[in-house]
């Protein structure tokens, strides 16, 4: 974590007073579960807190920037900005994916590149930063890391894998593509969905995500990787 602390200070001028908070923010549940005897804390509670402060800050930004937009339009914009694919992108932008501690099984299954894990990590970091430095420092970090991309709209550049999969399969004839939720796990504030995509009633691939739509996109992405 020494390298992470140096990076945060160099890139963002952030020095954590409570190093345990930072360490917890970068500890996935899979790592904590594999080291239960050490009683290691994981980042789910910090994620919960970070999600709340991020919702507030983005809501405030949108409210100020778009004084003529209705509540429904503002909600849609906020959802686009704080969805897991966007937050995972910001985690990668900050280099956070290199520092998260994962269990061996999660690491082997590609967890370090999984949007749901990296999106949660970004929120957990914000939660830890809030507790250590206060909301103004979180606000400054969000303004530096996120808002420039929000202004340019680059946070929206997420591939629609479902459409790509549909176009690929239908280029070979009529097919029936179906997405089914096969598993739900996690606490109410951090649900994780597993979705299976099938073609003509034959299972093709699976995906996971913090929402059903995100899990469907992940399943379609995995299916495309298999077919192409």
From Swiss-Prot:
Q: Name one Pfam family in it.
A: dsrm
**Where does the DRBM domain lie?**
160-228
Keyword Transferase present in the record's keywords: the answer is no
Q: Which PROSITE patterns match?
A: DS_RBD, RNASE_3_1, RNASE_3_2
Per UniProt, which keywords does this protein have? Cytoplasm, Endonuclease, Hydrolase, Magnesium, Metal-binding, mRNA processing, Nuclease, RNA-binding, rRNA processing, rRNA-binding, tRNA processing
> SUPFAM superfamilies, from UniProt?
dsRNA-binding domain-like, RNase III domain-like
**In UniProt terms, what function does this protein have?**
Digests double-stranded RNA. Involved in the processing of primary rRNA transcript to yield the immediate precursors to the large and small rRNAs (23S and 16S). Processes some mRNAs, and tRNAs when they are encoded in the rRNA operon. Processes pre-crRNA and tracrRNA of type II CRISPR loci if present in the organism.
The entry's protein name is: Ribonuclease 3
What GO biological process, any one, is recorded here? tRNA processing
According to the entry, every stretch annotated as the RNase III domain falls at 5-134
Query: Which residues does the entry assign to the active site, renumbered to this chain?
Result: 51, 123
Q: Which residues cross the membrane?
A: none
Q: How does it assemble?
A: Homodimer.
Q: What class of enzyme is it?
A: hydrolase
Q: Quote the subcellular location field of this record.
A: Cytoplasm
Cofactor needs: Mg(2+)
Give the EC number(s) listed in the UniProt record. Answer: 3.1.26.3
The UniProt family comment states: Belongs to the ribonuclease III family.
SMART domains for the chain: DSRM, RIBOc
Q: By its UniProt entry, which InterPro entries does this protein fall under?
A: dsRBD_dom, RNase_III, RNase_III_dom, RNase_III_sf
Cellular component GO terms held in the UniProt record? cytoplasm
Its recorded reaction(s) are: Endonucleolytic cleavage to 5'-phosphomonoester
Magnesium as a keyword of this entry, yes or no, is: yes
